[in-house]
């Protein structure tokens, strides 16, 4: 019996398609910014390599840790409310990344153009305001990581789930590819200011996603199903006592530590090695390109 609302072609609901579409926009926004985050922190805000890598690393680590808690809360309040919260926070965060340098320039601490000229910003505590801005992004992103994949699971049946997740990962990687494609031509046109303006693009993508959720997303699933903090803690302790699972987690963690260098260190390395005409976005796009080409297989 079909009890899912507004079930569309090939067994998928409208909520499924909306979820995947906003995931596409969110991934475009995320990767457009994340591929140059460490460069933004150094070239726009004046952080040295160590400071930039620490801020970027803590941001990335928190983004993967917080879904343990935000996912449980999302189950309690429902996917629609969670998506609205997530995309609202992401929009504020990305637009904040764009506006913040303008405020620093207005204060006389820096001048932006094809190249950046610092007028005391590297010695100013004002640049650390970036941390709460990134924290807002971290919270919003942590909701998305748990919501969309769970929504795909809820909006598919046993017969359509495999294809549903193929579509989901296709959207993830199309978004990743598109987002990372934008920054290199933008750098060629306006220089280092591209690291500022790319945030407005990401903000626009998450605002579009927010409007899509508000206007189009309807689902009857997963309100009031979340676990309590005690249940989350009990589950965590069970994981910590399962040594086979811990070994698997360590192996997977090692892979992601290496993979994250595509964003943490590779862009700076490539630009410093090959010059300002280098295209780190295209190098990082090898991964999503291969996934998109092979996902159907």
Identify the residue ranges that each predicted region occupies.
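Intracellular juxtamembrane helix-capping segments at the cytosolic ends
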Residues: 143-157, 270
């Amino acid at each position: 019996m079909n009890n899912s609302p507004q079930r569309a072609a090939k067994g998928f609901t409208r909520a499924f398609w909306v979820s995947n579409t906003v995931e596409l926009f969110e991934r475009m926004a995320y990767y457009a910014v994340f591929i140059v985050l460490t460069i933004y922190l150094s070239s726009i805000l004046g952080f040295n390599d160590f400071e930039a890598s620490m801020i970027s690393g803590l941001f990335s680590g928190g983004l993967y840790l917080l879904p343990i808690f935000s996912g449980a809360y999302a189950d309690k309040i429902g996917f629609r409310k969670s998506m609205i919260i997530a995309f609202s926070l992401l929009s504020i965060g990305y637009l904040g990344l764009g506006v913040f340098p303008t405020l620093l320039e207005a204060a006389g601490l820096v001048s932006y153009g094809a190249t950046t000229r610092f007028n005391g910003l590297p010695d100013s505590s004002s640049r650390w305001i970036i941390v709460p801005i990134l924290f807002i992004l971290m919270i919003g992103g942590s909701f998305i990581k748990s919501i969309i994949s769970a929504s795909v699971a809820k909006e598919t049946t046993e017969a359509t789930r495999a294809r549903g997740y193929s579509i989901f990962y296709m959207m993830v990687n199309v978004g990743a590819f598109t987002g990372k494609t934008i920054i290199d031509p933008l750098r060629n046109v306006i220089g280092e200011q591209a690291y500022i303006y790319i945030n407005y693009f990401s903000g626009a993508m998450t605002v579009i996603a927010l409007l899509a959720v508000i206007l189009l997303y309807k689902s009857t699933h997963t309100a009031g199903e979340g676990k309590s903090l005690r249940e989350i803690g009990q589950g965590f302790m069970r994981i910590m006592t399962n040594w086979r699972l811990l070994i698997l987690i360590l192996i997977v963690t090692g892979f992601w530590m290496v993979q994250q260098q595509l964003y943490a260190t590779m862009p700076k390395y490539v630009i410093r090695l090959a010059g300002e005409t280098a295209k780190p976005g295209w190098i990082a796009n090898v991964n999503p390109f291969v996934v998109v080409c092979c996902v159907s297989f």
